[in-house]
Structure formats: C-alpha cells, structure tokens
C-alpha cells in the first residue's frame, strides 16, 4: 500500500511538471510569433509614464488650466496653454 502511494505521488508530480513545461513552451511560441524588440518595449514603458492630459478648448477654464497635469512627472507640461 505504501509503495502504491509513492508511485501515485511520483505520477502526480510528473504530470504537473509536464503541464508547467507545456505552458512555458506555449509562452515561448507566442513570444517568437509576436516578437518585440527592446526599442518597442522601451517606448511602451515610456508612453505609460508620459503626460496625456489634453483639454479641449470647450473645457478650458482658468481652474482646469491650472490643474491640467494628470501625472506629476517632470516632463509633463500644461497642455491648456491657450486659455
């Protein structure tokens, strides 16, 4: 009985390792099918940090002009400068 339990545990561990290996291979295949070079990844990371708070002229009030920076990064500029 004890031997059967050990064999069962070994089989379960083997099945789990096969599943994990298959998932890793699938992830590698997806990466090969849709490769992104470092420049593209860097650009995407920088776009997330960029200031994207553009106000249409219809919403340009004095208060909105002062508070038009959505993200507080040094490269953010107020985009409502023509109020």
Curated annotation (Swiss-Prot):
PROSITE patterns: SHKT
GO cellular-component term (any): extracellular region
Keywords per UniProt: Cleavage on pair of basic residues, Disulfide bond, Ion channel impairing toxin, Nematocyst, Neurotoxin, Potassium channel impairing toxin, Secreted, Signal, Toxin, Voltage-gated potassium channel impairing toxin
GO MF entries: potassium channel regulator activity; toxin activity
Subcellular location: Secreted; Nematocyst
Propeptide: 23-49
Protein name: Kappa-actitoxin-Aer3a
Residues at the site labelled Key residue for binding Kv1.1/KCNA1 (occludes the channel pore like a cork in a bottle), and important for the voltage-dependence of peptide dissociation: 72
SS bond list: 51-83, 60-76, 65-80
Biotechnology: As a specific Kv1.1/KCNA1 blocker, may be beneficial for treating Kv1.1/KCNA1 gain-of-function-related neurological disorders, specifically pharmaco-resistant multifocal epilepsy occurring in infants.
Misc: Very weakly blocks potassium channels Kv1.2/KCNA1 (Ki=2.24 uM) and Kv1.3/KCNA3 (Ki=1.23 uM). Very weakly blocks potassium channel heterotetramers formed by 1 Kv1.1/KCNA1 and 3 Kv1.2/KCNA2. Does not block Kv1.5/KCNA5, Kv7.2/KCNQ2 and the heterotetramer formed by Kv7.2 and Kv7.3 (KCNQ2/KCNQ3).
Disulfide bond keyword on record: yes
InterPro entries hit by this protein: ShKT_dom
